[in-house]
Amino acid sequence: MRILDLFSGTHSVPKACAQREGWSCVTVDLADSDYNVDVLEWDYTKDLKPREFDVVWASPPCRYFSKLRESNIGRGGMTKKSVKEDLETKGLPLLRRAMEIIAYLQPKKFIVENPDTGRMKEYITEWPHYVVDYCAYSDWGYRKRTRLWTDIEGFVPKTCAGKESCPNMERNPSSGRWRHVLATDAGGRGRKGTTRRLRYRVPPAIIVELLDLC
């Protein structure tokens, strides 16, 4: 099976593909990939052919879709207008380009991945999706609820099992309440956080389970 990984970033997809014999993955990103390109400037029709990939996986940058940006309005010159402009001029073009490449390549299956808490779901309304929690597929210590738009059928998504059942949770020593070991931000108040690069990873189990259905 041949997979194209758009916005490869942490290379979660090729790392997961290495678990299966016969799977190969071609990566695309600004650096450290098979195609080191800005997808907005890339003439992909010269490098790629329709139907040469069985699956296209795309993880468009989530930064400009994050609702957390709104909490920074008033800081560092950020305004409601600039947040909206960044979404429309920096975030959406990358998403639209990914959708355009998928349409051109005509893969058997596709997956577009992004945080479920972000605004990308406001702009992808025509595709079916699944919602998963990373803590149900890894021992990474944090939840990170994620949305997967895909035409893959038969996938059974898993979300957090909750207190006492989720191995990634612990009791807060101060309040006694259950919480995930790590926060999906820089942390604080006695709780360790995560780096952006760590949060950008996708658990191999999610990738393999999806691709096994292709």
UniProtKB/Swiss-Prot annotation:
Instruction: Write down the EC number.
Output: 2.1.1.37
Q: Which GO terms describe its molecular function?
A: DNA (cytosine-5-)-methyltransferase activity; DNA binding
Locate the coiled-coil region(s) and give their ranges. none
Catalytic center residues: 62
Gene3D superfamilies named in the record: Vaccinia Virus protein VP39 (3.40.50.150)
Q: What class of enzyme is it?
A: transferase
Q: Mind listing the GO biological process terms from this record?
A: chromatin organization; methylation
Recorded catalytic reaction(s): these are:
a 2'-deoxycytidine in DNA + S-adenosyl-L-methionine = a 5-methyl-2'-deoxycytidine in DNA + S-adenosyl-L-homocysteine + H(+)
The record's family statement is: Belongs to the class I-like SAM-binding methyltransferase superfamily. C5-methyltransferase family.
How it assembles, according to the record, is: Probably requires another subunit for function.
What does the record's miscellaneous section state? About 20% of the cytosine bases in the genome are methylated on 5'-CpG-3' sequences.
Function summary: This is probably the methylase that recognizes and modifies 5'-CpG-3'.
Q: What is this protein called?
A: Probable DNA (cytosine-5)-methyltransferase
- What lineage, starting at the top, does this entry show? Viruses, Varidnaviria, Bamfordvirae, Nucleocytoviricota, Megaviricetes
